From Swiss-Prot:
The gene is hisA. This is 1-(5-phosphoribosyl)-5-[(5-phosphoribosylamino)methylideneamino] imidazole-4-carboxamide isomerase. Its EC number is 5.3.1.16. It comes from the Bacteria. Belongs to the HisA/HisF family.
Length: 237
């Protein structure tokens, strides 16, 4: 299993939120670049970077910082947050980013996702499905739609998406374990690759995810708080 450290950027700092609440954040470093280098040094094979300000505003805010991270590290980056046009996708890819995460735009403009896939390929474009109570949340998790997780995955799979990042918002940053039953339902609904995110707090959580067929998981707070040893980044089977 691939364990992917999360680097969430807000107001120029590396932070973690609780349940996606912008008012409940903890700053771990004022240098996201240093944090990225730290995770690489300790064995990370990939980084998951989110521009939280961009997710909220709909326009990338920390492109310069993310570009610097791409220049400084030698591992692939997957980036999301405020990416809602082909022009911005191209900017990130040209900056050295490996994979683009599309979230809000998948719900609001599925045609753009199709065009992105046609232009850049399914290995470069993934869709983030952020769920609250089984429904898809958008706009940096500030709004919750009436569209179900299964429905958006089915629609995106039809246009060619091969990889989804599934996040349970109510567990994100809470260290209460992932929603195993919810993830099982998602896995049953699709043949696409699912990357799990939200609530992971221990080795046992990783074992449980692997047991149901998850091959990669994004971990944030559990790594920053030391609940998980750094060895999971390069030794976890």
């Amino acid at each position: 299993m691939e364990v992917i450290p999360a680097v969430d950027i807000k107001d120029g700092s590396c932070v973690r939120l609780k349940k996606g609440d912008f008012n409940k954040r903890r700053v771990y470093s004022t240098s996201p670049v240093d944090v990225a280098l730290y995770w690489e040094k300790h064995g990370a094979s990939r980084l998951h970077i989110v521009d939280l300000d961009g997710a909220k505003s709909g326009w990338p805010t920390h492109l310069k910082t993310i570009r610097e991270i791409a220049l400084r590290v030698n591992i692939p980056l997957q980036v999301g947050g405020g990416i809602r046009s082909l022009k911005v996708i191209k900017k990130y890819l040209d900056s050295g980013v490996d994979r683009i995460i599309l979230g809000t735009v998948a719900l609001k403009n599925p045609e753009l996702v199709k065009r992105a896939l046609d232009n850049f390929g399914s290995n470069r474009i993934v869709v983030g499905v952020d769920a609250r109570g089984g429904k898809v949340a958008t706009e940096g998790w500030l709004k919750t739609s009436q569209v179900t997780v299964e429905d958006i995955i089915s629609e995106m799979e039809e246009v060619g998406v091969k990889t989804f990042i599934y996040t349970d918002i109510n567990r994100d940053g809470m260290l209460k374990g992932p929603d195993i039953e919810g993830i099982k339902r998602v896995l049953k609904s699709t043949k696409a690759r699912i990357i799990a995110s939200g609530g992971i707090s221990s080795r046992q959580d990783l074992i449980n995810l692997k047991a149901i067929g998850i091959k990669a998981a994004i971990v944030g707070k559990a790594l920053y708080e030391g609940n998980l040893p750094l060895e999971v980044l390069n030794q976890y089977p």
